[in-house]
From Swiss-Prot:
Keywords: DNA-binding, Plasmid
Protein name: Plasmid recombination enzyme type 3
Gene Ontology BP, a term: DNA recombination
Region listing for Disordered, in residue ranges: 179-218, 374-413
One of the record's GO molecular function terms: DNA binding
Alphabetical list of Pfam families matching this protein: Mob_Pre
Other remarks on this protein: Contains conserved positively charged amino acids probably involved in the binding of the pre protein to the RSA site.
Function, in words: The interaction of the RSA site and the PRE protein may not only serves a function in plasmid maintenance, but may also contributes to the distribution of small antibiotic resistance plasmids among Gram-positive bacteria.
Statement: the UniProt record of this protein carries the keyword Iron: no
Length: 413
């Protein structure tokens, strides 16, 4: 039995929106995700937009068109909700490309009913990964025109109801799909996902720090520009310094005739000020031209952009890993159920065999068959404890229960 899978999450900044845009529209040159088959990327398609979009600009346009709230939108308001719709490979293996597209068309129909057609940003189907899936995005505008991700997404209970409605929608369209169990229902709070989220949050914070550095650099640059301009203005002002013309006697020793030498005499204090101004002019001229030309800011912006690209790639790698892990987990659910059924059947058969042979003969045969296989022997012992708990001490039962709990947690990771 295949499953209907729908996920939704809030996107908390324009930077993350840009990262999602690059992943959804395949804008990066290289991807760490090995599941992407670039030879099939041309098969991807968007059911909303004919051409690639700038998601942040598109969000602003949607808000301009559909927001009717009276309050000014906060700068930290969540303007973007991102989600994913898919099933498992067993389902898609039995679908032609046209059938797959029709499935996602029905999924888009559901999204339009839930969020409003005008609020849908994109519905991009990826056919170049192992399992076809659709990324979708919406602006969280309520029916009465307010921007509220909290109200549109809702709490855990609302998310569960949302997943129920999606499963019912696809069933009504003729798809025999079971509802994928939510992580809230199964309590599958995986340590790896938590680590991915922590790393994602780290990169978000790292970007914020770099952005603050950029703002600080720009402010410092503006301040330096003002100081340099002030120094230049000072240098351009006419200098009114008291001075005397230097003279010398001409003629004989007793002559009183004097003439100007062409030099001037100023005070030591004024001379020192001249030296300071000359030094200031020398110091600022090269730096001023560097800043005035824009090269300083361009160089710093280039450095910040390079760091920004690295952070976006890191965030994308983490989000891809998160998606892949969730997909693997969903695909593993039927296997886990089959294993549990097989174990139940095995216990029934072994119990019947023990009844027919007698416990002692049964134990001897099992020990003989597994004496060279320690793991099999241990498994047989564990099964026996489950089939005949009354034959074991309370302490042994508690130890076995603890082992089972650890094993179950391992199966959820």
């Amino acid at each position: 039995m295949s499953y209907s899978i729908v996920r939704v999450s809030k996107v908390k900044s324009g930077t993350n929106t840009t990262g999602i845009q690059k992943h959804v529209q395949r804008e990066n040159n290289n991807y760490e995700n090995e599941d992407i088959d670039h030879s099939k990327t041309y098969l991807n398609y968007d059911l909303v937009n004919a051409n690639k979009q700038n998601f942040n600009n598109l969000i602003d346009e949607k808000i301009e068109q559909n927001y009717t709230g009276k309050r000014k939108i906060r700068t930290d308001a969540i303007k973007h909700i991102d989600g994913l719709i898919t099933s498992d490979n067993d389902f898609f293996d039995n679908q032609t490309p046209e059938d797959t597209k029709q499935f996602f068309e029905y999924a888009k129909e559901f999204l339009e009913q839930e969020y409003g057609k005008d609020n849908l940003l994109y519905a991009t189907v990826h056919m170049d990964e192992k399992t076809p899936h659709m990324h979708y995005g919406v602006v969280p505008i309520t029916d009465d025109g307010r921007l509220s991700a909290k109200e549109v997404v809702g709490n855990k209970k609302a998310l569960t109801a949302f997943q129920d409605r999606f499963n019912e929608h696809v069933k009504q369209r003729g798809y025999d799909l079971e509802r994928g169990q939510s992580r809230q229902v199964t309590n599958a709070k995986h340590e790896q996902i938590s680590q991915y989220k922590q790393k994602t949050e780290y990169h978000k914070q790292e970007y914020e720090r770099e952005s603050q550095k950029t703002d600080h650099i720009k402010q410092k640059n503006d301040k330096l520009m003002q100081e340099y301009q002030k120094s230049l203005n000072t240098l351009k002002k006419p200098i009114n310094v008291p001075y005397e013309q230097e003279t010398e006697k001409v003629g004989g020793l007793f002559s009183k005739e004097i003439q100007e030498t062409g030099n001037v005499v100023i005070s030591q204090k004024d001379f020192n000020e001249f030296q300071k101004q000359i030094k200031a002019a020398q110091d600022i001229s090269e730096d001023y031209e560097y800043i005035k030309s824009g090269r300083a800011l361009d160089d710093k912006d280039k450095e910040i952009r390079e760091k920004d690209d690295l952070l976006n790639k890191a965030v994308e790698r983490i989000e891809n890993a998160d998606d892949n892990f969730n997909q693997l987990y969903e695909n593993a659910k039927p296997l886990k159920e089959n294993i549990e059924i097989a174990l139940k059947l095995l216990k029934i058969l072994l119990k019947e065999l023990e009844r027919v042979l007698g416990r002692n003969t049964f134990a001897e045969r099992v020990n003989k068959l597994t004496e060279d296989e320690p793991k099999l022997n241990g498994l047989a012992g564990n099964l026996d404890k489950k089939m005949n708990p009354e034959l074991y001490s309370e302490q042994e039962q508690q130890q076995e229960q603890q082992k089972n709990q650890k094993r179950d947690r391992g199966m959820h990771l």
